[in-house]
Amino acid sequence: MAQRTGLEDPERYLFVDRAVIYNPATQADWTAKKLVWIPSERHGFEAASIKEERGDEVMVELAENGKKAMVNKDDIQKMNPPKFSKVEDMAELTCLNEASVLHNLKDRYYSGLIYTYSGLFCVVINPYKNLPIYSENIIEMYRGKKRHEMPPHIYAISESAYRCMLQDREDQSILCTGESGAGKTENTKKVIQYLAHVASSHKGRKDHNIPGELERQLLQANPILESFGNAKTVKNDNSSRFGKFIRINFDVTGYIVGANIETYLLEKSRAVRQAKDERTFHIFYQLLSGAGEHLKSDLLLEGFNNYRFLSNGYIPIPGQQDKDNFQETMEAMHIMGFSHEEILSMLKVVSSVLQFGNISFKKERNTDQASMPENTVAQKLCHLLGMNVMEFTRAILTPRIKVGRDYVQKAQTKEQADFAVEALAKATYERLFRWLVHRINKALDRTKRQGASFIGILDIAGFEIFELNSFEQLCINYTNEKLQQLFNHTMFILEQEEYQREGIEWNFIDFGLDLQPCIDLIERPANPPGVLALLDEECWFPKATDKTFVEKLVQEQGSHSKFQKPRQLKDKADFCIIHYAGKVDYKADEWLMKNMDPLNDNVATLLHQSSDRFVAELWKDVDRIVGLDQVTGMTETAFGSAYKTKKGMFRTVGQLYKESLTKLMATLRNTNPNFVRCIIPNHEKRAGKLDPHLVLDQLRCNGVLEGIRICRQGFPNRIVFQEFRQRYEILTPNAIPKGFMDGKQACERMIRALELDPNLYRIGQSKIFFRAGVLAHLEEERDLKITDIIIFFQAVCRGYLARKAFAKKQQQLSALKVLQRNCAAYLKLRHWQWWRVFTKVKPLLQVTRQEEELQAKDEELLKVKEKQTKVEGELEEMERKHQQLLEEKNILAEQLQAETELFAEAEEMRARLAAKKQELEEILHDLESRVEEEEERNQILQNEKKKMQAHIQDLEEQLDEEEGARQKLQLEKVTAEAKIKKMEEEILLLEDQNSKFIKEKKLMEDRIAECSSQLAEEEEKAKNLAKIRNKQEVMISDLEERLKKEEKTRQELEKAKRKLDGETTDLQDQIAELQAQIDELKLQLAKKEEELQGALARGDDETLHKNNALKVVRELQAQIAELQEDFESEKASRNKAEKQKRDLSEELEALKTELEDTLDTTAAQQELRTKREQEVAELKKALEEETKNHEAQIQDMRQRHATALEELSEQLEQAKRFKANLEKNKQGLETDNKELACEVKVLQQVKAESEHKRKKLDAQVQELHAKVSEGDRLRVELAEKASKLQNELDNVSTLLEEAEKKGIKFAKDAASLESQLQDTQELLQEETRQKLNLSSRIRQLEEEKNSLQEQQEEEEEARKNLEKQVLALQSQLADTKKKVDDDLGTIESLEEAKKKLLKDAEALSQRLEEKALAYDKLEKTKNRLQQELDDLTVDLDHQRQVASNLEKKQKKFDQLLAEEKSISARYAEERDRAEAEAREKETKALSLARALEEALEAKEEFERQNKQLRADMEDLMSSKDDVGKNVHELEKSKRALEQQVEEMRTQLEELEDELQATEDAKLRLEVNMQAMKAQFERDLQTRDEQNEEKKRLLIKQVRELEAELEDERKQRALAVASKKKMEIDLKDLEAQIEAANKARDEVIKQLRKLQAQMKDYQRELEEARASRDEIFAQSKESEKKLKSLEAEILQLQEELASSERARRHAEQERDELADEITNSASGKSALLDEKRRLEARIAQLEEELEEEQSNMELLNDRFRKTTLQVDTLNAELAAERSAAQKSDNARQQLERQNKELKAKLQELEGAVKSKFKATISALEAKIGQLEEQLEQEAKERAAANKLVRRTEKKLKEIFMQVEDERRHADQYKEQMEKANARMKQLKRQLEEAEEEATRANASRRKLQRELDDATEANEGLSREVSTLKNRLRRGGPISFSSSRSGRRQLHLEGASLELSDDDTESKTSDVNETQPPQSE
């Protein structure tokens, strides 16, 4: 079940097509056939239909082939209705049986649905193919969904566990069990994948440097564990040979914070031998296949066939490459954080395990002793493990064993040696695996404590039932018994909770108890002992064997219900245990050996003492192993060897596993478990095949069928009321009346109508529950009902159709009758003559009517044509308007598009600004943290430097002392040598003692380890208790409100109780007085009447008191009006108080009886007592009546009085607390004030100066802000003007388009070209912005690189200094060593000094290594930044190339646009506006430059102040001679200087910020100017190109015209010459005319011929001219063909000349003709006209040329202006650079001054050290601090200079942030105003509180006085009572003096109350509630 990927639709592997399932035909078929399941050998179960019942047997017909069979009724299992086909939760099946479960799983598996729920289980069947249901899209599909909302999936289980953990704060667990190859490990990986994706910390947090590192490591832990713990078996190519429990810890927010892995039962025997066609662990094959040659030579690796432990050689895994897997394993280890040394050490151990197998022994000839003939393999093994070869060989062949108290060498046999080697190999690999798990846990544990919650994932083998099972199978089956018990118990609990929620009555059965007998059989410790306890017990006995163990087990557990003995002697099994999954036969071969796991302790000791640290770490607990020396001998019994063990030195495998399992179960019980049961479908690893018997066995073993059994005991089928009513209401048609009815009532009526047995159902609050099978029965009845309804419906439909067909036939019959009647009438009339006339005349009547209709149609057609013409006109008008509207719409759309682009650009700018701001803030935070780290590091180095200097001084003093003592010690050397010999002997004795102590120490360490493990368990228990406490706190939080109410009532009851206690004490005192009066009444019986009258008088007084109290009540009513709401609750509390009073009175009666017993002395006293009791009873009645009346009257007053006192006391306590806080704050402030008083004096002056400067700078900043805001406002106005002009221009263009039809086309073309140009310009601007951003980023990276280089240089200097110090110390150390070596043999003190020096040297070397590491880190950072810089350079080159391409494209578009003059005019207007904006920006730049100059001046001022401070520092240094006197002054000046430096730093930062702002503005202006300049250059270039093009065209035209003119001149000259010649000839002809008249006829003939030739010539001439014009036109269209066209023109001109020569020749021949002269004259006039036309054209072109020249001059003027502006900007830039150069010079000067100061300081230190060495040693720390401050100041100055240099680069960013800062400033002002208002309000509240405190104090003092009075009175009364009691005890006479002093005054709130002694103490208790009542 690897990662499922593919292109298929994942939903078909998750969701079921319900349309197929709810097919009515299938439902009807199931109902009709009564389908059931019968057993089948081949298919497990087959579907069949019941045909006939014959007693206990039933005849059935198989559904597949129709065969009939007889089956027992008990073997038949019901089939579920088709609606339950492929159900997602098998608990919903109404027929819960094995056949239905198997059928459902089979159907889903064949449909590709591998996950199915079964109640709490999720059953998974291995598909043996890739399914596309594990992608991240599927994870997102299940994320946040509940279990019932999505189909079954391992992701749904994971999501449910994760959500329950977050919501309920309860730990979760996911338990994956199943056979090997069922997919446990893959599902575990999918769970981890899902949790790592859902709970990843890389989506928002920044806890670690690498986001998502923990999740990545968590996912990479599996490949490592699989390589070392998985192997290929017959069933599974990647079988986990161990169990694991993965705990993933989460914090309170749900993010993963760590993980932990626990492993169980590694199959270590696979490392030494494997079954046929199986492999050992993957890592051996991966190492041998994937290791390189160098690694193979280091690990001494060979071929696969050269290792004995690889039993089957190399067996490849289909579809996998071990070489690739090895690389993946190594990569996973690197990701997990394994070091190279750790990986190499692990691989060495793996290679050593293989080498163990190649060690061979042979048996000696005459003895059984083993020998090693070849030790080559042993040498390789010892080389890999770091052991001595000889010692290893000796330990294997002749180990040293203990016999009694002595050790002897015992020879081993070949079998014993082979066994020892295999045991060592297995133990080595097991320890390596344990170390690997521990190392992975260490990498995954990111917290110092466990997370808030965790999800545990258990991947462990399921039940294993082989033919014969061993000790490992017992452990696995024992584990599964415990897990199944946990499941049964959990399922029982959940069912119980469900039934409780729904209010269902059910007698619950805890099915978890069913498995307890089997578990007790295995784990019970005693009475009788279980299997594991007996096994451990046998391991302790010397001669125990496996056979004795089996005998004891049978003896102890033979009668157990779950234990069986083998039935026959020939059975191979030793005993059987009946597990819940079935009976399992166990063979007890070598169980004692496996339980003890013995090793050769000699070799283990060697491994523990290995020179390889890793191997020694693996074998550190060597004392816990069971040694082979404890095995006394190998007996010949069938069960193995006997053992002799140490006492208490080891713990067996069974004990360890039982403890780990107990711990695991405790963890699981404290979690909410989720169960995943993995099923293997077949053993052939074939997809799509399912073996039913195999699946049934696994379902039985996995507990799925057990869960079904538990479900059947209850009500497994449950359905909500609405669904039940909707589905089954058809069965009870009249049970529910019409109208609305509650769902529960409706279901109850339906159940009553269905007459179901009450035991078959339960009705809950929202659902109705049914026993298994009830819903199937209802489904059958529903199907029968539906069948009846359908049959009735079909009958009705058929009747309706028959009636409809009958009506149709009736209608057809009546129609036939009509047709027959008409045909008969026609047959009668067809021969009648009149009928014939009628048939002929009738059509003629119709013709006349048609003419009239045609005329009407013509008229109608004319009307329609008129309407059509009218409509067409309107349509044309509408189309014209529509066209106009479309044009307007296009205009508006273009405007809207422009606005949208502007908005998008602004939004993009805002986003970039925000991102830039965020980036700058992050950079600032990083830099600040880096600075703090460097400062801390520098401080640490300085401290270390001081310590080293002090240490060096100490060493120098020690060396001086040792030099003096060395001579003395030389004399004592001889005696010391003798002492040394004695000491050496003592050392030997001490070493023996030390070895003993080491052993004892190891024992103690073992005990400590055990205590630590117990402590860990206790911590786990405490954590579980804390979980339970958290869960209870959730419940407590719900009850807090009720608790508060109860607390209030309890407080009120306590108040009433206290009152009643006071009253009780009063009554007790009264009783005491009365009892004291009993003896007195013997003598004073006559005076009782007077006493009674006195009591009556006191009653009168009480009434007076009552009246006074009523007055006080009326006075207090105003104060307690607001407490009237609590009156009713007070009544209730009073009733409770009265009840308590009655209880107390009963207690009082009990006390009275005790007193009576004490007083019962004589019979006379008894009689007197009875009489006195009667009298006392009467007095008591009277007193109780008075008390009741009194209480009834003053009870309300007491309560109100008490509440008022409580409020006052609360106010008093609040005032006290407030006062105490104020006093604490006052004291703290006073101490701070005292500490700061001395500093304030120094700071006030500096503060005033800095405040003045700050105000000045604030004013400058405000001016700059104002200027910036003014510039923004102007920019906005210009933008608005530009938009208005753009709109006007668009309107003009639209008018031109309407006016000129031809211009529309050109305007549209221009608009399209313009949009293209805008796009191109926007692209160019975007590229420009990107270039600027990249350049700024490059500059920033360069700055960071420079800063890092500077830091690196500083670190390098510090490192060099430290190296110098180290060298000096090393040289001193060498000298010290030489001196110490001379006296090494004599003095132990010198050895101690040597050790100290060595430690110091090691510390220094370690520090040096740390510095080297830091240097390497900086170097790596530098390289990384250099790579990033190179990448950015490449990107910049790419962007430049793109920009150049875009510029080329822009030039092409500019050439196309150059033909439109209107567009050029528009550009000219825009250019003018841009020039205006540029001038405004220039003015802004000048103002910002002035502000920059002012800031620089302020900086120079600060530098002057800094120089002054340095001068002061020099004065302080010069006055350092009087160090002792001026220390206090130096400290003051130091603090003042620090304050000044801090203030200067802040001022400098403010200046830097302002300078940054101005620099950014300047950069922004420069960028704008550059952009404008580039725009101007482009415009000028385009105009130049246009002018050059026009100039070329004009020159070409002029040349052509000149050539034509030259031709005309030639023709004119020839014509004149011919004219003259013709005139001469004319004269000759006139003279000879007479002679020529004769030949005229012939001449005329010749003339006609010549005329014909002349026409031909003229036609040829015209064609030549036409071709010449075409050539001219072609030459204008294409410049590239100019030369060829000119050649053609020349050729045509030559042809024209030849034709003209022929024409002239013809003219010469027609001399005599006048017509020829006329024709030539007319030709000349035509040529003159052509000449004049061309001259006019030339003049026009010259005018255009002059106009273009004037435009060119204007452009040149503008270009010169732009050049001047650029020159001014360059001058400003040069000025800024010169200023920066000045600041650099100033910095260098400051550095020189700093160096001079350092030099002076060093000179002063030397002088002072020479003069005052003692004083210097005391003040070195302070001087060092001053040095650090000076260095820090120099660094800060350098940093300030760097920041000044950077201001030019950062100015642009600050200028962009000005607007945000101004907005923030407004917000800060509002917050400050709110804070001021809040401060005023708090002040008022403080004043009011102080007034209330004063008032409370006054009232408190008043109450205190009253309380003191009451206390004194109470004490007086107590004294009187005590005296009376003493007298009563003595039996003396009692004088009633209390009768006269029974009253006193109690003043409260101005009211005077006279209270009797009876009420005094109760009143006192009311006044002071905290004082307990006085009672005896």
Swiss-Prot record:
Main location group: other
Entry GO MF terms: actin binding; actin filament binding; ADP binding; ATP binding; calmodulin binding; microfilament motor activity; mRNA 5'-UTR binding; RNA stem-loop binding
Residues of the IQ domain: 786-815
Signal peptide range in chain numbering: none
PTM remark: Phosphorylated by ABL2.
Record domain Myosin N-terminal SH3-like: where: 31-81
Residues found modified as Phosphothreonine: T1960
Any single GO BP term: plasma membrane repair
Superkingdom of origin organism: Eukaryota
One cellular component (GO) term of this entry: dendritic spine
Omega-N-methylarginine found at: R18, R1930, R1940
Comment field on protein domains: The rodlike tail sequence is highly repetitive, showing cycles of a 28-residue repeat pattern composed of 4 heptapeptides, characteristic for alpha-helical coiled coils.
Record-linked PANTHER family: MYOSIN HEAVY CHAIN, NON-MUSCLE
Function, in words: Cellular myosin that appears to play a role in cytokinesis, cell shape, and specialized functions such as secretion and capping. Involved with LARP6 in the stabilization of type I collagen mRNAs for CO1A1 and CO1A2. During cell spreading, plays an important role in cytoskeleton reorganization, focal contacts formation (in the central part but not the margins of spreading cells), and lamellipodial extension; this function is mechanically antagonized by MYH9.
Protein name as it appears in the record: Myosin-10
Lineage, opening ranks: Eukaryota, Metazoa, Chordata, Craniata, Vertebrata
Gene name, Swiss-Prot/TrEMBL: MYH10
